[in-house]
Regions:
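Short, structured beta-strand/loop micro-motifs enriched in basic residues and often containing a Trp
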Residues: 26-37
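Short, charged beta-turn/beta-strand-edge "cap" motif at the junction between a beta-strand
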Residues: 35, 55-61
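Short, Gly/Pro- and small/polar-rich lid/capping loops
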Residues: 5-26
Length: 109
């Protein structure tokens, strides 16, 4: 089903993307805030590590990035994650022996 009128042309404004305009997305800071498991992180992360998601994500464990990405996208495009303060999202890495807890938050510039 299409939103196009009978002429096949969409009304003005309907072609705009939803969410924040490209280049205007907020910066996201990702911090390791806790470790629940007994073993050291295989990537070397520890509580207190802080990363700028856009600049430093190559320095972060790929598993933590993979888990955090949906939450970061939610924050970037104006959504909220249930059970978290607005502008923040907590998630855990999937390594069962480590279980680092990460906090993603919007950085006001």
């Amino acid at each position: 089903m299409s939103n196009a009128g009978e002429s096949g042309v969409k009304p003005a404004g309907e072609n705009r993307p939803l969410g924040a305009p490209r280049g205007k997305r907020p910066r996201i800071r990702v911090s390791c805030v806790d470790q629940l498991g007994a073993c050291r992180c295989h990537h070397g992360h520890k509580s207190g590590d802080v990363f700028d998601f856009d600049r430093d994500r190559g320095k972060m464990c790929a598993m933590a990035c993979h888990v955090g990405f949906p939450y970061i996208d939610i924050l970037r495009y104006g959504g909220t994650v249930p059970g978290n303060e607005p502008g923040t999202a907590k998630f855990c890495c999937p390594e069962v022996d480590t279980l680092n807890v990460w906090l993603a938050e919007i950085v006001d510039e």
